[in-house]
Amino acid sequence: MCCRRVFRLSHRKEGMESARQTKRVRVYVSGRVQGVFFRDSTRERAERLGVSGWVRNLPDGRVEAVFEGEAGAVDELVRWCHEGPPHARVEGVEVEEEPASGGARGFEVR
């Protein structure tokens, strides 16, 4: 009985540690994503989730962003990008994983 309880605690601890792993992704969002407060909304959401990075408009009409933080928070922000703010019409989201730098602090609209 003692060993079983220890196993459960260590299993939960491992799950918590993997959720806390630092993750970094580069995201490209296409559709009607410029002129609809996508960048400001992304910054607000990132700050709420504790995700660092930046977001900018691209000349081809897409939005590019880099997110770095706890894996679960980064994943949640990427999921949000599939919908975006109320006036956006997201048609596609491309996600590229990158090595985490560990030095990212704050979130910037470029």
Swiss-Prot record:
UniProt keywords, alphabetically: Hydrolase
Primary enzyme class: hydrolase
Domain of life: Bacteria
Every Acylphosphatase-like domain range: 24-110
Record-linked Pfam families: Acylphosphatase
Hydrolase recorded as keyword: yes
Listed PROSITE patterns: ACYLPHOSPHATASE_1 (PS00150), ACYLPHOSPHATASE_2 (PS00151), ACYLPHOSPHATASE_3 (PS51160)
Enzyme Commission number(s): 3.6.1.7
Keyword Hydrolase: yes
Active site: 39, 57
GO molecular function annotation: acylphosphatase activity
InterPro entries in the record: Acylphosphatase (IPR020456), Acylphosphatase-like_dom (IPR001792), Acylphosphatase-like_dom_sf (IPR036046), Acylphosphatase_CS (IPR017968)
Reactions accelerated catalytically: an acyl phosphate + H2O = a carboxylate + phosphate + H(+)
Family: Belongs to the acylphosphatase family.
Full protein name: Acylphosphatase
Species of provenance: Rubrobacter xylanophilus (strain DSM 9941 / JCM 11954 / NBRC 16129 / PRD-1)
Taxon lineage: Bacteria, Bacillati, Actinomycetota, Rubrobacteria, Rubrobacterales
